[in-house]
């Protein structure tokens, strides 16, 4: 998307992993390397999951257990990825410390937790849903301001008395940096109108996500805030290493 002609025919649809790749040094560009388009989808249904027989089933219970057993609880992550930053955010907010184990992708985390190789995993609810319905896993909750519109039965960390918020996956569009303003505006107008369509909104909900339109300016502001948080978390993690 950075190389093609800025004529509106090449567009990237991505999420905040774009920022993490830059913060961790995987890439030399961030959102600033693009013309930021509108934001359209939020997946805030990402949280921690444990086995049904774990000695904790809420965030307060987990925090108490971790403080009584510092460094003993194993957390499966993908080092340098979205879930890694999520875990570091939880540690910073609560003062606990996990024994981090790099187990790979979302599906790999489920396999590791099911096999008893880790104690907890951070993951999307949509990935863990089948294991929750079978009674194998328990969802501790989401680090969001409000309950998910898609999974309203899952509590937030906040309502459990834990002051922990962490942005979920924020999906939006990115255009080549030098895309003319009139093309950007035309694209934004078309997307904004599309996001008002009830069928489109329902299709997004059916995928386990929430339809959340933000203008390019508001999305860029959100990305700047998220990147600043990632930079702080990554710096703290490296300082402690």
Language-model features, listed with the residues they occupy:
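Alpha-helix/helix-capping structural signal
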Residues: 17, 126-127, 199
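C-terminal lobe and pocket-closing loops
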Residues: 127-196, 225-228
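Short, Asp-centered acidic motifs that coordinate Mg2+ and/or phosphate
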Residues: 8-12, 47, 119-120, 139
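An extracytoplasmic/periplasmic, membrane-proximal ligand-sensing/linker region
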Residues: 92-94, 181-241
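Ligand-binding pocket segment of bilobal, Venus flytrap-like solute-binding proteins
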Residues: 72, 77-79, 83-154
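Conserved functional loop/turn residues at catalytic and ligand-binding sites
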Residues: 5, 58, 116-117, 136, ...
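Structural motif detector for alpha-helix initiation sites
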Residues: 58-59, 154, 216
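Hinge/capping helix and adjacent helix->loop/strand transition within the periplasmic-binding protein
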Residues: 3-9, 22-108, 159, 170-203
């Amino acid at each position: 998307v950075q190389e093609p002609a800025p004529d509106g025919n090449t567009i990237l649809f991505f999420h905040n992993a774009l920022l993490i790749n830059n913060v961790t040094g995987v890439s030399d560009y961030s959102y600033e390397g693009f013309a930021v388009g509108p934001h359209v989808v939020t997946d805030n249904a990402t949280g921690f999951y444990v086995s049904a027989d774990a000695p904790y089933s809420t965030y307060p219970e987990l925090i108490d257990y971790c403080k009584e057993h510092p460094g003993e609880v194993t957390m499966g992550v993908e080092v340098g990825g979205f879930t890694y930053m999520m875990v570091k955010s939880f540690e910073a907010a609560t003062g606990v410390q996990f024994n981090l184990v790099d187990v790979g992708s979302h599906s790999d985390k489920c396999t590791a937790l099911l096999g008893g190789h880790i104690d907890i995993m951070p993951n999307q609810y949509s990935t863990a849903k089948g294991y929750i319905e079978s009674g194998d896993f328990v969802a501790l909750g989401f680090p969001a301001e409000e309950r998910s519109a898609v999974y309203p039965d899952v509590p937030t960390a906040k309502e459990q008395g834990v002051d922990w918020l962490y942005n979920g996956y924020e999906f939006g569009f990115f255009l080549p940096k030098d895309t003319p303003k009139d093309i950007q505006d035309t694209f934004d107008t078309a997307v904004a109108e599309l996001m008002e369509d009830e069928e489109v909104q329902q299709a997004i909900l059916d995928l386990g996500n929430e339809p959340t339109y933000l203008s390019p300016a508001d999305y860029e502001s959100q990305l700047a805030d998220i990147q600043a948080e990632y930079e702080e978390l990554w710096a703290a993690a490296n300082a402690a290493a």
